[in-house]
Amino acid sequence: MYIKVLSVTDINNYIKNTMDNDFILNNASIRGEISNFKIHSSGHVYFSMKDQWSKINCVMFRSAAKGLKFLPEDGMKIIANGRISAYVKDGSYQLYCDKLELEGLGELYIAFEKLKNKLEKEGLFKEECKKSLPQYAKKIGVITSETGAAIRDIINVATRRNKNCEILIYPSLVQGTNASSDIIKGIKELNKVKDLDVIILARGGGSIEELWVFNDEELAREIFKSKVPIITGVGHETDFTIADFVSDKRAPTPSAAAEIAIKDLQELNSRLENYKNALNYYVLNNLKEKYNKLDRLKLSMEGNSPERIIINEYNKIDFIINKLNSYIKIEVDKRKEELSRMSILLSSNNPLNILNKGYSVIQDGTGKVINTIKELDKEKKVTINLKDGKKEYQIQ
């Protein structure tokens, strides 16, 4: 038996009043994905929230939308807070939002953008504030984990491009609570090293939480204050951190950072050879022009027999030839001497020269260097590296 016949408006009003007096519906917090997001000319925001099975229409009035800390987009996963009420005219209900929050990593994203905007306004990202990188770095400092893939990648690049380049490694934490202070200390210590050309701050890939240390404000300011130029090679190519924005040069990976810092020795030799060839071409071309000019003079003056003029022209040419030959020899000798001096300097800094002094390097089966007697377990196979070769032994 039905209680009472109601009009459509009456039942819609009843539903609205019921919803407006419901505690849960008046304090709703809903998780879902944004779709059909639109900003009206009035400033009101309209969108839907959906999950795998359902969707709900949402509205956020201009007064509440002004407090948004991010610009919502379709596909974003959010948590919407507000009240659910009915719209009497068409019998629909919707969520009236007071606040929107990004789900999961949203708070980190907001913190990142807030710090980025702050430091950018202070001028820490300006190109004119960035220090120039040395053209030919001979001594490089590296701040990274001593056990991570980043240091292996950097050493491999250094060995391939210029094995005489001196690498100073400052072992540091690169994630976790104390990592930022550890890296800051490393920057300060390496700034004390005499004749240090550049610092590489590196870490392999990881999640946003693992890379979060490189979004630390104190670390960013220390990078900015560094007197030695700093190259960052953090994560993968798609990873960007605050440290990348404030550093003097951002590289997409640790390997790329090493390639920026360490010039290829073969490339330098090739460049020197190109200079030599260009100089030879210039000299030969100049001589050819002089000889052609002389031939023209001889032809034009042949009937008048101006022997003295011709002799003078030949003397001028001989003088030019001698001068150019002398210039070529001086320049080539100078380049050879400079290259020899660089080679001797780089060779003297080669860490492998220590083997020539009677020392040895012991590695386990994986290639890891053994530093303490505790690592020499019985039956363990090791490789002993000496200046004239290496040999495997088994610990008894």
Curated annotation (Swiss-Prot):
GO MF entries: exodeoxyribonuclease VII activity; nucleic acid binding
Protein keywords: Cytoplasm, Exonuclease, Hydrolase, Nuclease
Catalyzed reactions per annotation: Exonucleolytic cleavage in either 5'- to 3'- or 3'- to 5'-direction to yield nucleoside 5'-phosphates
Disulfide bonding pattern of the chain: none
InterPro entries given in the database record: Exonuc_VII_L (IPR003753), Exonuc_VII_lsu_C (IPR020579), OB-fold_nuc-bd_dom (IPR025824)
Coiled coil spans: none
Listed EC numbers: 3.1.11.6
The protein's assembly and partners: Heterooligomer composed of large and small subunits.
Location within or outside the cell: Cytoplasm
Protein name in the entry: Exodeoxyribonuclease 7 large subunit
One GO CC annotation: exodeoxyribonuclease VII complex
GO biological process entries: DNA catabolic process
Gene: xseA
Function (record text): Bidirectionally degrades single-stranded DNA into large acid-insoluble oligonucleotides, which are then degraded further into small acid-soluble oligonucleotides.
